[in-house]
Design a protein with these regions (language model features):
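Conserved polar/disulfide-associated segments of primarily extracytoplasmic proteins
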Residues: 28-64, 72-193, 235, 247, ...
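Short, aromatic- and cysteine-enriched interfacial helices/patches
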Residues: 6, 31-32, 296-298
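Extracytoplasmic/lumenal ectodomains and periplasmic regions of secretory and membrane proteins
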Residues: 185-249
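Short aromatic-glycine motifs in intrinsically disordered, low-complexity regions
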Residues: 53-66, 214-224
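Bacterial N-terminal signal peptides
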Residues: 10-20
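C-terminal single-pass membrane-anchor helix
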Residues: 248-304
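Bacterial N-terminal signal peptides that target proteins for export
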Residues: 1-10
Length: 304
C-alpha cells in the first residue's frame, strides 16, 4: 500500500492548486490530468473507504457524534490512512485524532478532496469569561504583524500572508462553541483554515478543515449541523464542570483563536501547511510542497 500512498501524495500535491479542497470528489479525468496512470488508478480504486453513518461513540473523549446527513465518518485507522498515507502528513501531528468526516459521494481514498478532521485535546476546562471582551480586530492586527515578521526570515516564494478573518471569531455561549476561519495567501494561491471548537468540562473537541475560498459559504451553511453533531456524555459536558474536582485549563478563548494550541488541534497540512506550534503562527506551505515533491519523486526515481 505504501507505494500507492506515495503516488497519491504526488497527485494531490500536483493538483492541489487546481482543485483546492473542493467538496466535489476527484474524478478519473482529474486524476489522469494530474499524472496518475490508468493501471495505478485501477489498483487505487480497490482501496475503498468504509464510512459509517448514524450515532458513533467517541470513547476517548466521552462524547458521541451523530454523523450529519451527506457525510460519512471514517474511524481513526481510516482517518490516519487518509491524512498520513494519502495526504503525507507527519504521523506525530495526529496524536489525538478521533476520525474525519468526508462527503458521502466518495467511494475510495484517492478521490477524497476535503475532510473535516476531528480531534480531542484533554486540556481541561476552558473558562469563557473573556468571550465578550476580546477585540478580534486588534488580535488580527497582532497576528498579521507576526506573519510579516516571520516572513522576513523566509525566501520570498515561501512567504505567507494572513489576509484576515474569513469568518470573524464568534462564541456561542449557550452551546459553548467557538468558531472562526482565516484566509492565508501564498504565492500559489489562497486557502482558508476553518476552525470549530466544542468545549467540554475536561477539554475540547476540534473540527478543522482547509477549504477553497469559494467553498466557505458551503462550510458556513453546514457549520451548525457540524457542531451540533458532537455531544458529550452525561457528566462530561461543559456545564458539568466541578471546580473542586476538575482541572482548569490555562487556555482562554482568545488564546485558542490566536493559535496557542493549533499543534494539538489537527490543522491539516494537506496543502503543505505544517502544524503550527505555540502562539506564533509560522506558515511554510511552499517549503512543504517543494520538500514533498522532492521526497516523493526522489523515492520514485530510486525505485526505478
Amino acid at each position: 500500500m505504501r507505494n500507492f500512498s506515495l503516488s497519491a501524495s504526488i497527485i494531490l500535491i500536483a493538483s492541489v492548486w487546481l482543485m483546492l479542497c473542493s467538496f466535489t470528489p476527484y474524478s478519473d479525468a482529474d486524476l489522469f490530468s494530474a499524472g496518475v496512470s490508468e493501471e495505478d488508478l485501477k489498483t487505487l480504486k480497490e482501496d475503498v473507504i468504509e464510512g459509517q453513518t448514524g450515532v458513533i461513540m467517541l470513547s476517548a473523549c466521552h462524547a458521541q457524534i451523530e454523523v450529519p446527513e451527506g457525510f460519512l465518518f471514517l474511524d481513526e485507522p481510516q482517518a490516519r490512512k487518509l491524512l498520513i498515507d494519502y495526504w503525507d502528513n507527519p504521523e506525530s501531528n495526529f496524536d489525538d485524532l478521533l476520525g474525519v468526516l468526508v462527503p458521502d459521494d466518495n467511494e475510495y481514498f484517492l478521490q477524497i478532496s476535503v475532510a473535516f478532521v476531528i480531534t480531542y485535546d484533554n486540556c481541561g476546562y476552558i473558562k469563557d469569561n473573556d468571550a465578550n471582551s476580546i477585540d478580534y480586530n486588534e488580535l488580527l492586527e497582532t497576528l498579521q504583524k507576526d506573519f510579516e515578521e516571520n516572513n522576513k526570515s523566509l525566501p520570498e516564494g515561501n512567504r505567507c500572508k494572513l489576509k484576515g478573518w474569513t469568518v470573524t471569531p464568534h462564541y456561542d455561549q449557550s452551546n459553548h462553541v467557538l468558531i472562526w476561519a482565516k484566509t492565508l495567501e501564498f504565492s500559489s494561491g489562497e486557502v482558508v483554515n476553518y476552525d470549530m471548537r466544542i468545549l467540554g468540562k475536561d477539554g475540547l473537541v476540534s473540527i478543522n478543515a482547509v477549504v477553497n475560498p469559494e467553498d466557505v459559504d458551503e462550510v458556513v451553511s453546514k457549520e451548525s449541523t457540524m457542531v451540533q453533531s458532537i455531544s458529550f456524555d452525561k457528566g462530561y459536558a461543559y456545564a458539568d464542570f466541578n471546580p473542586a474536582r476538575d482541572k482548569v485549563s490555562d487556555w482562554t478563548l482568545g488564546g485558542l483563536v490566536a493559535g496557542s494550541i493549533l499543534a494539538k488541534t489537527g490543522v491539516l497540512s494537506k496543502l503543505g501547511l505544517l502544524l503550527l506550534k505555540f502562539w506564533k503562527i509560522i506558515a511554510v506551505g511552499a517549503v512543504g510542497i517543494v520538500a514533498g515533491l522532492k521526497k516523493l519523486f526522489g523515492s520514485k526515481k530510486t525505485k526505478e
